[in-house]
């Protein structure tokens, strides 16, 4: 999931930017969509940026969260390394991050087999704030690598 729409207050460092009112509303919508359409989230991996943390808070998802500084400005490989650290007791993981990493990660993880080509194309064109890519992974989180997942959905709450 990409963080929700952020504000741009003067004098605030990028890492510390808060959500805009629209972002607060859309993060809530994202949480509602996640609860209605996917299995319960067991764990969250979230950027330490204020807007990412606030996005998670406003989704209402109350799963245990690990905040990783490395997710801010990360390359897809760095996010994969963080995913590889997730325990096998987790079946549904929510990753809250930033662009352009979130879209690149979804495309990098997507395999040809099982991936919805139309979804991949939509993500390649634009991954708006609060966008949620849904990937299915078989096996252990420690084994997640490029091409290991089926990209099966994409939702932008509005």
From Swiss-Prot:
The keyword Cell division does not apply. It comes from the Bacteria. The keyword Hydrolase applies. Keywords: Hydrolase. GO terms for molecular function: hydrolase activity. It is an enzyme of class 3 (hydrolase). Signal peptide: none annotated. It holds the Pfam family His_Phos_1. Its EC number is 3.1.3.-. Belongs to the SixA phosphatase family. This is Uncharacterized protein MT1313. It comes from Mycobacterium tuberculosis (strain CDC 1551 / Oshkosh).
């Amino acid at each position: 999931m990409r963080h929700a729409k952020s504000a741009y207050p003067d004098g605030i460092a990028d890492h510390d930017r808060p959500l805009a009112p629209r972002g607060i509303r859309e993060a809530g919508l994202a949480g509602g969509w996640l609860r209605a359409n996917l299995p319960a989230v067991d764990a969250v991996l979230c950027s330490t940026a204020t807007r990412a943390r606030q996005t998670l808070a406003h989704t209402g998802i109350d799963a245990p969260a690990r905040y990783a500084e490395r997710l801010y400005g990360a390359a897809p490989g760095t996010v994969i390394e963080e995913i590889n650290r997730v325990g096998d007791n987790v079946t549904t993981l929510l990753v809250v991050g930033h662009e352009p990493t979130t879209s690149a990660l979804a495309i990098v993880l997507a395999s040809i087999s099982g991936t919805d080509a139309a979804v991949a194309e939509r993500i390649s064109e634009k991954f708006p704030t609060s966008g949620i890519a849904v990937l299915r992974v078989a096996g252990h989180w420690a084994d997640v690598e490029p091409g290991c997942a089926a990209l099966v959905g994409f939702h932008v709450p509005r």
